[in-house]
Each structure stands twice: as C-alpha cells, then as structure tokens.
C-alpha cells in the first residue's frame, strides 16, 4: 500500500514535532504548529494534514529509543519515583499522574503533571503555603475539552545534588473523578493513581 501525499506530510510533521518535544521540551500543541510551519512553509495547514497527539507520541517514543536509549529509561524511572513521593504528600487531594511521565515518553525536559480532585482548590493552595512551597498559579484546559479551564499550581521540587524538577498540579472538582469521564475526543482520560504508578516502577525495575 502506498502512502498518500497527505499521509507522508502528516508523518513528516509528526516526526519534526517529536524531535522538538524530545530535544527542547516543547508541548504537543506548539510543537505541532512549529513543525507544520517548518514543513509546509506559508501554506495553510489543513486539518487532515496535521497528526494527532497519538501519532506524535509514537514518534517521541521512537526518537527516545533511537537517540536517548541509554539515558531515557533512568530519567523516566527517576521522575516516576519523584511523582510517587509528591502523590504521597498530596494523598488527601486524590492525586493522579498524567502526561509524559505516565505514558513513558518523559525526557530530560519533562515535568511531572498531576491531576488533583478535591472540593476546594484553595485547600491545596493553603496546604502548599503551610509547607513553604513557592508556587505559581495559572490555568490549564480541562480534560473534557471545550472552553473549560482548571486552576493549575506549579512549583520546583528541590533535588539534592541535581537540578530541581518541575511539578504541575491541575486542580479539578471531586465530581470530575466520578463516572467514565472522557476527553473531548471521546477517549478515556489517561491517568494513574499512586498504586498504578508504583506498579509501573516495579515493572521497570524487573
């Protein structure tokens, strides 16, 4: 079967975006836009030409295996172990791991992304302040899509003998955790509780 011109362009854009994500720590949306401009120039990128995040994620995995195969697994393990520590600390807020540290594509520039499910975002802020955590407040898109946003608290986690790691806490209402919540694309949200993350770590060590 021959690939169509559109499929070839889509694959080329996905590969370029994956390189930006793996090498520079770009997020998927900006990497996709920059890659499309890089490949298409001034031509308008029609929707069917742009790869979806799943295709880009596959390319990130391939890139990591090819160029960072000797360092990426240890980096991923380190971030997952740190994620467990943070999740233990924030257990009262129902933390779930998401993003690159969960799906296995995390690299040198990746941060830890957690979703918290609680009745009050202010309680999370107060908890962090009482722990002397210096955090910044921003907004992230709700995983259900649309125009909804959620408060996100970001901070640097100090590391003995190495650079601090970035942690981002997207604070959802506790009701968002109930039922079969799906994203705007209809796919079930990818997230893992602390027990699931611990199992991933055991699998990596075995």
Model-predicted segments: where are they?
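Catalytic core of pol beta-like nucleotidyltransferases
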Residues: 2-25, 29-108, 118-206
């Amino acid at each position: 079967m021959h690939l169509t011109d559109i499929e070839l362009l889509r694959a080329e854009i996905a590969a370029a975006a994956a390189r930006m994500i793996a090498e520079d720590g770009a997020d998927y949306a900006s990497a996709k836009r920059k890659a499309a401009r890089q490949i298409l120039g001034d031509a308008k990128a029609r929707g069917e030409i742009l790869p979806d995040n799943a295709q880009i994620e596959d390319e990130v995995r391939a890139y990591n295996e090819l160029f960072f195969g000797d360092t990426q697994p240890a980096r991923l393990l380190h971030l997952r172990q740190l994620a467990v520590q943070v999740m233990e600390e924030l257990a009262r807020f129902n933390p779930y791991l998401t993003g690159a540290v969960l799906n296995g594509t995390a690299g040198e520039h990746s941060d830890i992304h957690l979703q918290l499910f609680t009745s009050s975002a202010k309680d999370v802020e107060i908890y962090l302040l009482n722990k002397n955590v210096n955090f910044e407040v921003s907004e992230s898109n709700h995983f259900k899509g649309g125009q909804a946003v959620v408060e996100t608290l970001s901070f640097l986690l100090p590391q003995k003998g190495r650079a601090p790691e970035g942690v981002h806490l997207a604070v959802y209402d506790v009701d968002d955790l109930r039922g079969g919540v799906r994203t705007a694309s209809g796919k079930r949200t990818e997230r893992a509780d602390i027990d699931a993350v611990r199992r991933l770590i055991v699998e990596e060590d075995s």
